[in-house]
């Protein structure tokens, strides 16, 4: 039973997560020839202040990009 853990910076809508889950599940089902009900997808929302790119938080990068 495949378990897919997707980590994203928080802020994505439930609708967007549902679409990602649908597509990931379909791809794994097709490639591994498994029923879709055997595939688990979990989302982890990470606060922008806890996600670092290099040594800078995503929160700071977003603020910088808005200037």
What are these regions (language model features)?
Residues 2-67:
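A domain-level signal for the structural core that forms small-molecule/cofactor-binding pockets
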